[in-house]
Swiss-Prot record:
Function: The alpha subunit is responsible for the aldol cleavage of indoleglycerol phosphate to indole and glyceraldehyde 3-phosphate.
Name the record gives this protein: Tryptophan synthase alpha chain
Family of the protein in this entry: Belongs to the TrpA family.
CDD domains: Tryptophan_synthase_alpha
InterPro entries for this protein: Aldolase_TIM, RibuloseP-bd_barrel, Trp_synthase_alpha_AS, Trp_synthase_suA
GO CC terms, sorted: cytosol
Subunit record text: Tetramer of two alpha and two beta chains.
Key words of the record: Amino-acid biosynthesis, Aromatic amino acid biosynthesis, Lyase, Tryptophan biosynthesis
Known EC number: 4.2.1.20
Top class in the EC scheme: lyase
Superkingdom of the organism of origin: Bacteria
Matches recorded under SUPFAM superfamilies: Ribulose-phoshate binding barrel
Active-site residues from the entry: E50, D61
Highest classification ranks of the organism: Bacteria, Pseudomonadati, Pseudomonadota, Alphaproteobacteria, Hyphomicrobiales
Length: 278
């Protein structure tokens, strides 16, 4: 049976376009608003949705996503509730792939086997766990693959040809190329450097390569999508959400649309790469 992820990339390939991949923090600014945002994203043009699992010590994340995680935790978000968020989303959307992104500790505490069973039954398609290197694949990666979940690995500008085969060995779904070194949201992506980096990764794998970190505008999204199988946007969407909150950090009537409207503009940027190529 074809996975949701493979089906989505096959569909995109047949349409001659790159994926628009969105990241939002699960439970930010509260579980109910978060579900409304996730439901709005496919209508805005998101092809794949990454949902952050809030964690108290998010070392790879910049200030925006760290703050989003803290807002979610303050609103009572847990890993169990994140899985429930996916389950609720799946009631109305059976096609859009969902990837959970975060850190190993909450999964370890939840229990790996139980987490994988619950994630699969909730309708999760893949995992990105930023603090588990390939040397620790037996912890979660191999069990996840056996459970039928994609395990998506990060590659960076410092991942050289010697290291790349280890990074790619058990990766499935897609490869997430981090276009800048450092934390999320720190700088703008350089589309010219991305092209050669994606080509280098593709010499080692047939998997789609999606590029993230530093994409904030439709123009940058378009430039990146011209070189990659997907463009990932997170910090810009999280910032749009934050700007819509009231003084106490609570959702307003504008919050869902603030995220969806920016997502729609970015989706147009990604689709513009296809038009430019034709």
């Amino acid at each position: 049976m074809t996975s949701r992820m493979d089906a989505r990339f096959a569909q995109l390939k047949s349409e001659g376009r790159s994926a628009f991949v969105t990241f939002v923090m699960g439970g930010d600014p509260d579980p109910e608003t978060s579900l409304a945002i996730v439901k709005a994203l496919p209508q805005a043009g998101a092809d794949i949705i990454e949902i952050g699992m809030p964690f108290t010590d998010p070392m790879a994340d910049g200030p925006s996503i760290q703050a989003a995680g803290l807002r979610a935790l303050k609103a009572g978000m847990t890993l169990r509730k994140t899985l429930q968020l996916v389950r609720s989303f799946r009631e109305g959307d059976a096609a859009t792939p969902i990837v959970l992104m975060g850190y190993y500790n909450p999964i370890y505490i939840y229990g790996v086997d139980k987490f994988l069973d619950d994630a699969k039954s909730a309708g999760v398609d893949g995992l990105i766990i930023v603090d588990l290197p390939p040397e620790e694949d037996d912890e979660l990666c191999i069990p996840a693959l056996k459970a039928g979940l994609n395990f998506i690995r990060l590659a960076t500008p410092t991942t050289d040809d010697k290291r790349l085969p280890a990074v790619l060995a058990n990766t499935s779904g897609f490869v997430y190329y981090v276009s800048i070194t450092g934390i999320t949201g720190a700088a703008a992506a350089d589309s010219s450097a991305v092209g050669s980096a994606v080509a280098r990764i593709k010499r080692h794998t047939a998997l789609p390569v999606c590029v993230g970190f530093g994409i904030r505008t439709p123009e940058t999204a378009r430039a990146i999508a011209a070189h990659a199988d997907g463009a990932v946007v997170g910090t810009a969407l999280v910032d749009a959400l934050k700007a819509s909150l009231d003084a106490e950090g609570r959702a307003t009537a504008k919050t869902v649309n603030a995220v969806a409207d920016l997502a729609a503009a970015l989706a147009q940027g990604v689709r513009g790469a296809q038009q430019a190529a034709e």
